[in-house]
Amino acid sequence: MNTCIQLLILCLVTVINSENLTDISTETTIENEIENATETELSEAIEKETENVTETELPDTVKTEIQFETQNLPHNPKQKYCRTEGQYCSRTYFHRCCGNLVCQLHGFFNGTCVQCLAERKFCIWSSECCSKRCRLFRCRKNPYVQVIPY
């Protein structure tokens, strides 16, 4: 047991030392290149790099990444491991829906996160149903809400 721990520590120290050595070698290489380059060479290199990037290229990339990341974030910061709308859920602590989303079950502990439950879907609380009326574990029509056709 002690031998395994010692080997593990030795491996970790070796990995950390090798990472530090590569960092130091790249830093010295960069310093040498900077010393050898003149100001005009540096300004020309910067101009060439900026010419290669178009104005529309950066905002689209950043915009896409931000939209993708915000879709994966939970609605409530206290809920770290929750599912967003349309993702798999099971009505358990491990696979729960974020915020006000509800898990609509399709089978035994197999469902999808939705805004609210439709009529005749399995429910526990009235707040889970779109009609706000849960009776005998099913969402029911709300007699007080009238739908007026156009």
Swiss-Prot record:
State where the protein is found. Secreted
Where does this chain mainly localize?
secreted
Q: Reply yes or no: does the keyword ATP-binding apply.
A: no
Q: Which residues are glycosylated?
A: N20, N36, N52, N110
The beginning of the lineage is:
Eukaryota, Metazoa, Spiralia, Lophotrochozoa, Platyhelminthes
User: What's the entry's take on its domains?
Assistant: The presence of a 'disulfide through disulfide knot' structurally defines this protein as a knottin.
The protein, known as: UPF0506 protein SJCHGC03144
Instruction: Spell out the disulfide connections.
Output: C116-C130, C123-C134, C129-C139
**GO cellular component terms listed in the entry, alphabetical order:** extracellular region
Signal sequence segment = 1-18
Q: Which family does it belong to?
A: Belongs to the UPF0506 family.
Transferase as a keyword? no
Record's keyword terms, sorted: Disulfide bond, Glycoprotein, Knottin, Secreted, Signal
Concerning Pfam families, the annotation shows: UPF0506 (PF11703)
